[in-house]
Amino acid sequence: MAGEGQRAEPEREGWALYVTPRAPLREGRPRLAPQNGGSGDVPAYGTPTPSRHGRREVRFSEEPPEVYGDFEPRAAKEKARVGRQIPLEGFRPDSAKEEVRESAYYLRSRQRRQPRLHEAEEMQTRRAALLQQQPHSPPPPLRPSPVTTRRGLRDSHSSEEDEPPSQTVLSQTVTKKAIRRTQETPVMSEDPLISLRRPPLRSSRSEAASVQQKVNFLEEGETEENDQDSFDSDVTVKVRSGDSVESGDQTTRSSSQYKESFWQSSQSGDFTAFDEQPLKLSSGYQKTPQEWAEKTVRIRTRMLTSSPGMRSIYGSFSDDDSVQKSELGNQSPSTSNQQMTGQPKSVSSVKTKRYWPFAVIAALLIGGFLYTRPPEAETTAVQEFQNQMKQLMNKYQGQDEKLWKRSQTFLEKHLNGSQSRPQPAILLLTAARDAEEALRCLSEQIADAYSSFRSVPAIRIDGASKATRDSDTVKEEVDQELSNGFRNGQNAAVVHRFESLPAGSTLIFYKYCDHESAAFKDVALVLTVLLEEETLGTSLGLKEIEEKVRDFLQVKFTNSDTPNSYKHMDPDKLSGLWSRISHLVLPVQPENDLKKGICL
């Protein structure tokens, strides 16, 4: 590549003036020299080989021609229809023509080209020769094109893979512990038009490698360091991360003791350098190596504060922070690094992180106070009911444990309902003849315990006193007593000798004991049934006792011998009534210490 001459462009005549020029053919790679030492038949680099004549050159489109290196606008072509046209290739320097050919090759062939070591050395040698031939006249700035931009991005990725991690540009070897000051390479200023180039193509590297960053460094207040440097200029630093910039005897190398992970994180800046520009400032003033060393230290510090990888460490810093530049202008790398690491975060973020735990705690306390605090009235009612039941347990010690446990749990659950109660609590107590007084006392005291919080006695209805009366009249009386009592604040009622009521009158309990449409749902009804047996065995289970009570009521309400019972009650109605009053059936045992007519 170093010794390749420039090809002469053929002149266009006749109809060729009106035809869009075809893109240059892809130049083949140089063949490897034979192993036996003979190299007479090895073609020069760039010579098309006959072995690849069958490959078809695929062009994406005939328009626009700018894609294939022809940057002449369409309007200029239409005006200059007559006359000899001079190709634009002639006005480009040799290095630009070479790049156009290579870029057209890369555009048609998407496969990444892996540069070799000897090719990189030849390119560096040719660039050094061009710089020596033109020391005082810099070449005109090239118009950036999509092709050259893609090539710059691709070469930056290739050079990152080829070069060892110990080599870097602009001394990116900065850690949190220390900054080693090394020799720095002067970085040239670029044409502002370069910043307007098209974004790079999608690459297989990480997203951080596709983001290009510009670091603007404004020279100001440097009269105390350099008496000659009295001008202000903006230096745009664009360095391709991973490429080595060689100028004279100045090189940039990193220490081998830094870790590989930090090297990869420093690559994410993806700075871009253009090798075609001489190492000069835009103002034409060239500094000594010592001045460049001091200048690059400040540039390096600015890049660290504005790079995406380090921005999360130092907080949020803007690239045009004048206070930051004035403080870092006269400091050494180590001093500036210590100052940067000690920089606090923004005031708003600190205040937010300081006060948000208190806000969360306050919200939790308020929510717990409003939603998790149980109602004080219901808690007190349950506690009062439990105290009353404990007293009854101490008085009536002859009762079975199942009576206390099941009745207390059943009524306490209904009393402690935090939501609206779906149905009333129905408790049915039964006993034999020997426990008639205990049945009466316990039923009344349990109902009073349920309503003890309201300090009102339970409603009492005696069915034995209404046995011989008309069923319709008894039905109206029972309905009136229950409805008036519940409306006046009483929430419990006890009905003694339920089996003695006229059969027709018991249908009123459909209204008060229904599962879904009960007239009062936040009340408790205690019903008692006195069996005809003399003694109720203690060995009977709850299921057997429930069946015994059901059979007894069926005989009592449907027997034709019973007055006023047959025409008002049938088995279907009795089954519906039984399903509503048999929520919980519990037996009551006799008490020896209980006297007739006096409860304990």
From Swiss-Prot:
Keywords: Coiled coil, Glycoprotein, Isopeptide bond, Membrane, Nucleus, Phosphoprotein, Transmembrane, Transmembrane helix, Ubl conjugation. Signal peptide: none annotated. GO terms for biological process: nuclear membrane organization; positive regulation of ATP-dependent activity; protein localization to nucleus. GO terms for cellular component: nuclear inner membrane; nuclear membrane; nucleus. Residues 372-600 are perinuclear space. Gene3D superfamilies: 3.40.50.12190. Residues 247-261, 325-346 have a biased composition (Polar residues). It is a single-pass membrane protein. Residues 1-14, 71-81, 91-102, 116-125 have a biased composition (Basic and acidic residues). Residues 1-261, 310-346 are annotated as: Disordered. Residues 376-452 form a coiled coil. Pfam families: LAP1_C, LAP1_N. The modification Phosphoserine is found at residues 61, 137, 145, 156, 158-159, 189, 230, 233, 244, 322, 332. One of its GO terms (molecular function) is ATPase activator activity. Belongs to the TOR1AIP family. Interacts with ATP1B4. Interacts with TOR1A (ATP-bound). Interacts with TOR1B, TOR2A and TOR3A. Interacts with VIM. Required for nuclear membrane integrity. Induces TOR1A and TOR1B ATPase activity and is required for their location on the nuclear membrane. Binds to A- and B-type lamins. Possible role in membrane attachment and assembly of the nuclear lamina. This is Torsin-1A-interacting protein 1.
